[in-house]
Structure formats: structure tokens, C-alpha cells
Amino acid sequence: MLEIIPKYRIIVVEDTLELPVESLRNLQYNIIRMKVRSALLKSGTEVSADDGIRTSLRLGDSSLIIGEIRSTEAEALYEAMRVGALANVVAGTIHGASAYGVFDRVVNDLKVPATSFKATDIIAVCNPIKSPDGLHSWKRMLQLTEVRKHWREDPLIEKGFTDLLKYNVKKDELEPTDDLINGDSETLKDIASNVKGWAGNWDAIYDNVLLRAKIKKEIVEVAEKTG
């Protein structure tokens, strides 16, 4: 969420209040939190997650963050993503051990049409890494996967997933894949197509990616030193 430019309004839809909304407000982010009813409850004073998402669409250009996608709100979410109703980032959390696991959950469990799933651009897979004795664990991002748009029914069989970053457990770090290094990213190229100096220039795009990585690394190192 910190990657969103503060001038853009952020709408957070959650049934359990977990995201650091107040901290972001203290950093001058324009952020609205909408508390919705749990998917486990059929009635109550709070609106459903489905209605919460549809209400957020009426607020105009915003970034939409869903705390966790659990039920029928998935259909409303993908409807918004397909039509570009929010004109900015749409992100959410869903349980899945891999990119295909997310696809399986969204399409087969939550009944979102497979063609609608193509509105997904990027899937970040996070899971705990355990110590050999099983007593310790660390949360890590294991892969960053791009969802291509050319497949029809099954993105796994039809090569609709492309890993851009993969976790190296020995080095304890994310590493770029050959696809990313060689410029085989439709998402990044699509973003770059609207940026002067980046369109059609993969070297400029990748240099900027590396620069941003160095900036983030410096921020983390300073934070660790200063506590």
C-alpha cells in the first residue's frame, strides 16, 4: 500500500480490521476504511463485502484494497477490475499456495468465470519458511507471477503464468527470473507504454526496476539500524 502515491484515494474493505490504516493516515495518505460483515454471517448491521465493494465503485477514481477475498464478493471485485471502474490499483488477499492455487480458488470455489480471472495482472505468493527443527518460521514472498492473457481455459496448461521473481531459500532472497531479465513481461511493458522514454526500451525499464530495488534496500537497512 505504501507504493500507492498519497494523492490517490485508497478504499480499504475489511471484515477483520488488520491493515495499518491509521499509520497510513499519519503519513498523509487519503484513505477510507469500510468495515463489512464477515462472510460467515448471513445477517447483521454491517453491509456485506459484496455490497461494500459495489459501494466503493460509486466513489469514483480510487485504489481498492480488499483485506481478504472469501466469498461472493470475488464476483463484484472481478467485475470492477474488468471494466476498470476504479482507474487505479485493485489488490486483495486470498488463500493459495501458488499462482494456480489462486486461480483454482477464484474460479472453482468462488465461481468467477475463468475469462474474468484474466483481469488479474500479478500474483504475489507468500508463505512461511521454517527452520530445520520446525521451531522457527519466517514469512517470505516465494514468487511473483504474471498472468498472461492469451489462454482460454487453463492458464497452467496453456502457459498463462510467467514467474518474474522466485525465492532462493539458500540466499534468503528473491531473485529475478530469466523471463524478467530478458524483458518477457507483458505487465511491465504495458505500464511502460505510457511513460516517455520507457516505451519500447526494455533496458530503461529494467534499470528503473533495479534502481527502485536499491532504494527499497536502503530504506530497510536504515530502518533496521535506527529501530
Regions found by a protein language model. Give the residues of each.
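C-terminal non-catalytic accessory extensions
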Residues: 225-227
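Conserved P-loop NTPase
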Residues: 122-213
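Switch/coupling sub-region of P-loop NTPases
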Residues: 2-129
